[in-house]
Amino acid sequence: MNRPFFIALDFDEHAKRQRFLESFAAETLDVKIGMELFYREGLSVVHELKEAGYRLFLDLKLHDIPNTVGRTMRALAELDVDVVNVHAAGGKAMMEAALEGLDAGTRAGKQRPKLIAVTQLTSTDSRMLAEELLIDKAMDEVVVRYAQLAQESGLDGVVCSAHEVPLIRAACSDRFLTVTPGIRRQVDQVGDQVRVVTPGEAKALGSWAIVVGRSITAAADPLAVYREMNQDWKGATEH
Ligand SMILES: O=C(O)c1cc(=O)[nH]c(=O)n1[C@@H]1O[C@H](COP(=O)(O)O)[C@@H](O)[C@H]1O
């Protein structure tokens, strides 16, 4: 799977989501089904988008006791999506259980979905880390430690900000994947995101994949913005 550009399909209405995808009929898309879409449309949206041939990231960010996460991953494996995720904060035993569940649920002849762990959300800043979560280490240090823990647990990669990708690449194996949301063009509103970069910056920093939502989904001309951002992503030089 090379260098996905996942569009986050965070829509509050089935019709809006359908109209949006219809306007992209000429493009081969990678899409992300997040909590909003999944809790609204359920498994039917996964089946529909899978049958339509999209590369799928099912972003449900599991975070629970190891037994529950393992059994849930076993169920999710049957959906045959490309990427699923957990929160690294659930710890090593939980991540190992997630991987075991995913392995056990993957049907013969199918490829196991890639399993990645959210390190620190891209909406989290240093103040929140220290004052709300009571983590007294620097953001970079926390993210790299969580990435190492994910790697030790056998996971394929992490979700992080592109800012942290060079440090993760130095600390983890070459094959370890970095999926980076918090992507904006210079002209876009940042909104609730904190650790933000452009697609070109993400590529230059070494991100394996980017995740883009509102810059495209809330744009007046989503297709034009997608093409502009994809050009920036594909065209940038990796350092
Ligand atoms: O796991 C994710 O996809 C994720 C992790 C993270 O740290 N930050 C983050 O923004 N995301 C998701 O990426 C998408 C970003 O959307 P926009 O901020 O609209 O581009 C949303 O669907 C988030 O749920």
Swiss-Prot record:
One of its GO terms (cellular component) is cytosol. Keywords: Decarboxylase, Lyase, Pyrimidine biosynthesis. It comes from the Bacteria. Pfam families: OMPdecase (PF00215). It comes from Shouchella clausii (strain KSM-K16) (Alkalihalobacillus clausii). Homodimer. The gene is pyrF. Belongs to the OMP decarboxylase family. Type 1 subfamily. This is Orotidine 5'-phosphate decarboxylase. The active site is at K61 (proton donor). The keyword Transit peptide does not apply. One of its GO terms (molecular function) is orotidine-5'-phosphate decarboxylase activity. NCBIfam families: PRK00230.1 (NF001273), pyrF (TIGR01740). The keyword Lyase applies.
